[in-house]
Regions:
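Gly/Pro/Ser/Thr-rich low-complexity, intrinsically disordered segments predominantly at protein N-termini
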Residues: 1-150
Length: 150
């Protein structure tokens, strides 16, 4: 469990993703932190928020959907809490990319800093951004960071 402030931030993050998802269900499926994935490397991970494309979701059997399926999310978000070591989260973000993630955001509320991870590119660091775009991975999704930062 996390403290109330971290819980509020998680709630804002997942609510914004779910609202976008509700209007774009044909594109894929969104998940919050209790949903786990078995990455192709064999590691089991549960990002704070994630999304997989409809094509990849439809490729899973009904049985696989009830477990931690062997699939890496197309999109992941990790939200740093007070107890998280930044280096551990950065390692996790690199692991997601190595296993097939197409877009990843590491949000650090304490420093109001975002690291954006994309395959084949250096990590992009933003200081105190107000919003983030889902780019071509989540078309039309914009995360309002003012609601996450609080």
């Amino acid at each position: 469990p996390v403290g109330w402030e971290s819980s509020r931030r998680h709630s804002s993050l997942t609510t914004q993703l779910r609202v976008w998802h509700a209007a774009n269900e044909e594109l894929g499926e969104a998940f919050e932190s209790s949903g786990g994935f078995t990455l192709p490397s064999g590691a089991i991970r549960s990002p704070d928020a994630s999304w997989i494309s409809r094509q990849r979701w439809d490729g899973l059997t009904p049985e696989q959907r009830t477990t931690f399926p062997q699939v890496c999310p197309d999109f992941v978000v990790e939200l740093r809490s007070q107890s998280d070591r930044l280096s551990s989260l950065q390692e996790k973000m690199r692991e997601y990319l190595e296993n097939g993630t197409r877009l990843g955001w590491l949000l650090d509320p304490k420093h109001r800093r975002v690291e954006i991870y994309r395959p084949g590119y250096d990590v992009e660091v933003l200081e105190n951004p107000v919003e983030l775009s889902g780019e071509d991975v989540l078309p039309g999704f914009v995360l309002n960071l003012r609601k996450v930062w609080g």
